[in-house]
A protein has these predicted regions:
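Short, glycine-rich nucleotide/cofactor-binding loops
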Residues: 4-16, 38-42
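Anion (oxyanion) recognition and catalysis
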Residues: 26, 52-53, 96
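A glycine-rich helix N-cap at a beta->alpha junction
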Residues: 48-75
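Short acidic active-site motifs
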Residues: 45-48, 90
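C-terminal structural segments of small proteins and small subunits
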Residues: 75-104
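Residues at the starts of beta-strands that form the adenosine-phosphate
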Residues: 4, 27-33, 57
Length: 104
């Protein structure tokens, strides 16, 4: 099994850093999982968010998504399926599953 990296993103800033970090980890053969929560769910609507598709398992906090007024716009977020709009339990699973866990 490949080494894995979990990334918790809670800020709607620095998407470029998240993309670069994810690309670097993927290039090194790491399995990457990213959970977006709080204001970070806004990043799902940024054009560069699509650069993460295929490089990581992407999940968004459904509660944060709704709290930010995005309910009904789930299909606009690339690479994130219905089941990937999850609760903080998904974040807890990610932290338990991954060899390394970063908070941004």
């Amino acid at each position: 099994m490949a080494e894995s990296l979990g990334i918790l993103v809670s800020s709607d800033r620095h998407l470029d850093y998240v993309v670069k970090l994810t690309r670097a980890a993927h290039k090194k053969g790491k399995e990457v999982q990213i959970f977006f929560t709080g204001s970070a769910v806004k990043l799902g609507f940024e054009p560069d968010f699509a650069k993460l598709v295929g490089l990581a398992r992407l999940s968004l906090c459904d509660v944060s998504f709704r709290a930010n007024g995005f309910h009904g716009r789930e299909k606009e977020v690339p690479g994130v399926g219905f089941k990937d709009f999850a609760t903080q339990a998904r974040n807890a699973e990610m932290s338990a599953e991954c060899d390394r866990y970063l908070v941004l």
